[in-house]
Amino acid sequence: MKIRFLGHSGFEIKMKNHTLVFDPYISPNELASHINLSEVQPDFVLLTHGHGDHIADAEQLSKDNDALCISNYEVINWLGAKGVKGHPLNHGGKKEFAFGTAKYVNAIHTSSFPDGTYAGNPGGFVIWDDEICFYHAGDTALTLDMKLIPLTCPKLDFAILPIGDNFTMGYEDAAIAADYIDCPKIIGCHFNTFAPITIDLEKAKEAFKNRGKELILLEIGDSIEI
């Protein structure tokens, strides 16, 4: 599996014959200006919630690539009114897609569209096929609900967790979250995009190391194989 960091909470993940893109915030992000949106070619676009820094490029990527959007009911309805094809999930629900299974799980955050309208409750995704399982937490606080993931899903090979604090949990809480989800390999997201979420990267790595976990911090545009 190849994972490319698109900046902020955005990732391009290649699973066998399908490409998934999560929370694309590329074109408005000056830190991601070296990424050409036309070269991001998803089969599926997965959106954890409706905030602009998570859905900014969802409409264009979906239409340009005839990609299916997957998110909560309200996000899919909002995008559907713009001509985007989608499939709605809600909390605790899972669905088989061409790439494997997607389960929409709880997150503690807020969610509204850029125009201020209600975007439903935010969530995260657990994704798996017959070879690998991973969790993209979206924007969330540390929550005991995370302990349900090992009880209801296959064992995680890695997880993508927000670590930037202020708007989500910080790296100290994210390291505890790694314990809750029983996952030794964490990819950090939602950090250093804006001033309020600027963190000390070495301290973040140390917080995970102290709990026997690995924190992977990718540069925007960089990839990793798992």
Named regions from a protein language model:
Residues 56-113:
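Glycine/small-residue-rich loop that forms an oxyanion/phosphate-binding "nest" at active or ligand-binding sites
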Residues 22-23, 42-50, 70-73, 135-140, ...:
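Active-site neighborhood of phospho(di)ester-bond hydrolases with catalytic His/Asp-centered motifs
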Residues 114-123, 128-179:
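Active-site-proximal loop/helix segments of hydrolase catalytic cores
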Residues 28-29, 51-56, 76-79, 93-96, ...:
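Active-site environment of divalent metal-dependent phosphoester hydrolases
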Residues 12-51, 56-60, 74, 110-116, ...:
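Pre-active-site segment of Zn-dependent metallo-hydrolases
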Residues 68, 80-93, 175, 179-226:
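Binuclear metal-ion centers of metallo-dependent hydrolases, dominated by the metallo-beta-lactamase
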Residues 1-19, 26-29, 96, 103, ...:
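Zn-dependent metallo-beta-lactamase
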Residues 57-64, 82, 148-149, 173-177, ...:
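A short acidic, amphipathic alpha-helical/loop segment
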